[in-house]
Design a protein with these regions (language model features):
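C-terminal accessory/binding modules appended to enzymatic or scaffolding proteins
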Residues: 449-452, 459-461, 558-565
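Strongly charged, low-complexity linkers/loops
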Residues: 508-517, 530-565
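Charged, conformationally dynamic linker/hinge segments
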Residues: 437-444, 451
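Feature representing long, continuous alpha-helical segments
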Residues: 324, 474, 488, 492, ...
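Extended, non-catalytic structural segments that build the interaction scaffolds
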Residues: 434-438, 478-485, 516-528
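Basic, nucleic-acid-interacting segments
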Residues: 1-435
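M16/insulysin-pitrilysin zinc metalloprotease superfamily fold
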Residues: 391, 419, 490, 498-510, ...
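Core structural elements
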Residues: 214-226, 292-302, 348-361, 418, ...
Length: 565
């Protein structure tokens, strides 16, 4: 595809956890699966400084959800519960952000002011997230950096059952650096390249966390006839380019649908749509789904002018979009459209009867909702509103990345009414002395480090990239200095053993400096042979409380005494 021709533009937002204590208290920033207390609350939208209410917050409030919070004394205090004012901002986290900004040649702010960003999806107990602008401007290669910010991470979602959502507070308050690029990214492959460059620069500070969930990437994508769409929660580098490609196809598909609808209908045709109760017509249906949902209430439907054949197209899947958005806001589970009928046990004769009742024309579709009457009515009204947006083309919205690299609706695009000043945290002056101290202690630039690794460790360009992108370069250098006679074994472990274990779905992110030192200390002491490293490493990852001696003994990997051979 010619991405320049279609006017492709993309910008990245990288959110990276910093390896320090929490942002507004001294609690450790470690994930604790088990909590020892819990509490719950409802959250409601508040007005901004100018008296406006953010539309994204309003959409969230309509879901009327109850939030249950699970916490541990080891990783949370009253600050996370929003029962105590925030303490002074974490100075180490601020310095990491300032260091990153200097490395990117960004312009630092004179004074750091924290703001409150309204978030009432339950991921923040106070109904807002604290965030502060650190720097503006800067560049990564040919891509501009718009902002560098410091913010607190959100709570970790544990489960969602109906209208009750359970969050863990262990993650809430972990410092995050946010780096947002300009819309200068030229194609999907370029997206991945820039994300890699930013990742290397962040790891150069030596103060970022590693592992699943410690870095999250949001992507803003638009094409010339489309709209800016923000895609949140892309977990891996490999998914970035695929998500961008599929979003382009989705937007092209929506633009094509817009053109088809222009030929079939006028906007006014969607203005006076009537809901029709079809419960009596489906009461004898052989469909198990229909019978189950009818017991909860009723079935209603409406004629959707001009949409026949447009609801199940591969790249857009409008029918699924109707169902997802209606479910997010109302909780409804039963939305059916005519492009997937006959189906779900609904037979062709029933479809024909419904088409006649609703007086469908050749190009018309029908949409059915089943369940409690109030829920059904609200859900169908939402579907009608979505259809009205589709006739205008690509909606400007926030979407969620899915495991197959497609996306689904998440919420409307937030506006300026989302932000207001944080009055509980004092402004922080960024003095010349402070900046000089940062500049005098800058880490090694990634490009220089790359050259040095190739020169010092006699490894090639691709091997160097692999080690530097793993996040283990600091451990690697420490091990080579401590065990110089094992240099080749250490290199082989980082280049081959780690990737082999990852292919077995073994999480190598739990490997730390202490574990590696114990492994190579025992090897140097001839307690086992170097061929056993993969098995020992695997055992210690799966049994993190075990010692190196336990691993050697359990795996039966004692080195053979050459004198006994």
């Amino acid at each position: 595809m010619d991405y320049e021709k279609i006017g492709f533009k993309a910008g990245l937002e990288i959110h990276q956890q910093l390896d320090t204590h929490k942002l507004f208290c001294k609690c450790q920033s470690a994930i604790k699966e088990d909590g020892n207390y819990s509490f719950g609350r409802f959250l409601r939208p508040t007005q901004s400084e100018l008296g406006d209410v953010d539309k994204a917050a309003l959409a969230e409030a309509k879901k009327n959800r109850y939030f249950l919070y699970t916490a541990s004394d080891e990783s949370t205090c009253l600050v996370e519960a929003d029962e105590e004012p925030p303490h002074a901002a974490n100075s180490e986290a601020i310095d990491i952000c300032l260091t990153t900004a200097v490395l990117m040649n960004a312009t630092l702010v004179d004074e750091i002011h924290f703001m409150r960003k309204i978030v009432i999806d339950g991921s923040n107990t106070g109904g807002f997230q604290r965030t502060a602008l650190i720097a503006v401007g800067g560049k990564i290669d040919d891509v501009g950096i718009q902002i560098i910010a410091l913010e607190e991470d959100a709570a970790r979602k544990i489960e969602e059952k109906g209208r009750i959502v359970n969050y863990g507070l262990d993650r809430l308050g972990i410092p995050l650096i946010e780096i947002a690029t300009g819309p200068d990214i030229k194609n999907p492959n370029h997206v991945k390249e820039i994300a890699e460059r930013i990742g290397l620069l962040l790891r150069a500070t030596g103060k970022t966390k590693r592992g699943l969930g410690t870095i999250r990437q949001d992507l803003n994508v638009s094409i010339s006839k489309g709209e800016r769409v923000e895609i949140k929660g892309i977990q891996s580098l490999s998914s970035l380019s695929k998500v961008a490609e599929k979003e382009v196809l989705r937007q092209i598909g929506l633009i094509n649908i817009k053109e088809i609808l222009k030929e079939r209908i006028e906007k006014k045709d969607l203005e006076d749509i009537k809901l029709v109760d079809i419960s009596s017509y489906l009461k004898d249906s052989k469909s198990n789904i229909v019978q189950k949902l009818l017991k909860e209430g009723c079935a209603k439907a409406f004629r959707l002018p001009g949409f026949k054949g447009l609801l199940k197209l591969n790249d857009t899947k409008l029918g699924k979009e109707f169902a997802v958005q209606a479910n997010i806001i109302t909780g409804i589970g039963g939305i059916i459209h005519s492009d997937e009928l006959p189906g779900y046990g609904i037979e062709q004769k029933e479809v024909d009867e419904l088409r006649a009742i609703l007086q469908l024309k050749d190009n018309d579709a029908l949409v059915i909702a089943l369940g409690k009457e109030n829920t059904v009515v609200n859900a169908l009204k939402i579907v009608i509103e979505i259809a009205k947006k589709v006739i205008d083309g690509v909606p400007n919205e926030v979407r969620r990345a899915l495991p197959d690299d497609t996306t689904e609706f998440m919420r409307p695009m937030p506006g300026a009414a989302r932000m207001y000043p944080e009055t509980d945290v004092q402004p922080i002056r960024v003095t010349k002395d402070h900046i000089d101290r940062i500049k005098n202690n800058l880490p090694e630039e990634p490009i220089e480090k790359h050259k040095r690794f190739m020169r010092e460790y006699l490894i090639n360009d691709e091997q160097t990239k692999q080690i530097l992108s793993s996040g283990y370069e600091i451990d690697f250098e420490k091990l080579v200095k401590q065990f110089p006679e094992q240099k080749n074994v250490i290199i082989r472990t980082f280049l081959n053993t780690f990737s082999e274990l990852e292919k077995e779905k073994i999480d190598t992110n739990v490997v730390d400096e202490k574990m590696l030192i114990n492994i190579f200390s025992a090897l140097t002491a001839d307690k086992y042979s170097k061929e056993a490293i993969p098995e020992i490493l695997k055992y210690l990852i799966l049994n993190p409380k075990s010692s190196i001696e336990d691993a050697i003994k359990t795996c039966g990997l004692y080195a053979t005494d050459s004198n006994k051979i």
